[in-house]
């Protein structure tokens, strides 16, 4: 359990074996993010299409930074994989460039991951005086904050889990929703996500309709993931989406108010538009890279977009899909293998070795 007592010597050792991994493109708020990292951990920046201003900021930054870069702009899964391959640290703490850590959070999350392989902190969503900013904060709280999941940030995990969840950190094909797919494999392996509510990060306020662009991209990722079989596909898509959206909007109105539910309805439209856009146009040109085993995993009761919790039937269907793709993901019977006294020396998995060579 993450609440088990851990000595300070073990925590210091854990900090020395931790890397904060941040995917970065053109967000200059990365300066505030780095400034909030109040421990001597490795800081890994995984660049994907960086702007000149970002490159200048990195070159002039006083703290040591490990920098890697991918050509696939906007591919968060590939960026995180490159970041993981660029470091040999045992514990990977995923963070976003538009967020900052509260004091002491890095240490708290390292302490927790020493006795729990995956630990999730809490996001505090900022808001401005604008109505859309306030509604965005309420919707984000509802959509990501009312259940425990492996959606990042902030998320820290022991890289030893990778060999137990299919041999890879994140799916590079789906571009978006990469943390959602990661969460599904954790459930297949029976690896729990421990929630640490006191580990708070602050998300910068979002303005205008920027959040709709994010949900559109999530929809594209959903479309790719359904085609490759790492997400389930509803057997009757239109009816399922109508049912799932109606139920979710009722819950949103109950928990966050009618205004938030109305805005969430627009986000749902953006999400499903993104899925249709992928079906028609393949905007990331990924279909040529699908494995030969790629096929839809159809179910009558598909996985809701709002939650990552899998039913027993959904677990069986996804386990079968991974097995058909050549990945056997079995339940881990002894989680103590991930404890700091049993982890052994820090080292990368075979998948990490391959990605390091690619980098």
Predicted features, each with a name:
Residues 104-131:
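Conserved donor NDP-sugar-binding/catalytic core segment of glycosyltransferases
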Residues 92:
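Short aromatic/hydrophobic "clamp" motif used to bind/position activated sugar donors
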Residues 26-39:
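Short, well-formed alpha-helical segments that are part of the catalytic scaffolds
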Residues 175-182:
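Acidic donor-binding loop at a coil-to-helix junction in glycosyltransferase catalytic cores
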């Amino acid at each position: 359990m993450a609440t088990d007592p851990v000595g300070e010597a073990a925590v210091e050792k854990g900090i020395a074996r931790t890397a904060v991994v941040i995917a970065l493109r053109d967000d200059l708020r990365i300066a505030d993010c780095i400034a909030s990292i109040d421990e001597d951990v490795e800081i890994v920046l995984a660049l994907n299409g960086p702007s000149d201003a970002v490159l200048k900021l990195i070159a002039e930054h006083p703290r040591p930074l490990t920098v890697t870069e991918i050509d696939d702009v906007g591919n968060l899964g590939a960026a995180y994989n490159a970041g993981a391959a660029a470091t040999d640290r045992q514990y990977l703490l995923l963070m976003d460039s538009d967020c900052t850590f509260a004091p002491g959070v890095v240490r708290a999350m390292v302490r927790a991951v020493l006795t729990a392989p995956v630990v999730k902190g809490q996001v505090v969503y900022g808001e401005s005086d604008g109505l859309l900013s306030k509604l965005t904060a309420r919707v984000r709280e509802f959509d990501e904050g009312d259940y425990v999941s492996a959606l990042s940030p902030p998320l820290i995990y022991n890289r030893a889990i990778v060999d137990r969840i299919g041999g890879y950190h994140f799916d590079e094909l789906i571009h978006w929703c990469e943390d959602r797919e990661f969460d599904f494999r954790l459930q297949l392996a029976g690896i729990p996500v421990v929630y640490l509510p006191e580990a708070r990060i602050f998300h910068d306020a979002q303005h205008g309709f920027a959040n709709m662009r994010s949900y559109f991209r999530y929809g594209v990722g959903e479309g790719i993931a359904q085609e490759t079989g790492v997400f389930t596909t509803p057997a009757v898509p239109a009816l399922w989406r109508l049912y799932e959206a109606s139920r979710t909007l009722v819950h949103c109105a109950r928990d966050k108010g009618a205004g938030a539910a109305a805005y969430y309805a627009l986000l749902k439209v953006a999400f499903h538009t993104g899925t249709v856009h992928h079906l028609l146009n393949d905007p990331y040109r990924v279909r040529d890279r699908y494995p030969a085993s790629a096929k839809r995993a159809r179910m009558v009761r598909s996985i809701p977009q709002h939650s990552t919790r899998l039913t027993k039937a959904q677990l069986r269907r996804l386990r079968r899909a991974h097995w058909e793709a050549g990945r056997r993901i079995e339940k881990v019977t002894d989680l103590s293998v991930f404890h700091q006294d049993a982890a052994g020396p820090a080292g990368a998995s075979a998948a990490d070795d391959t990605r390091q060579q690619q980098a």
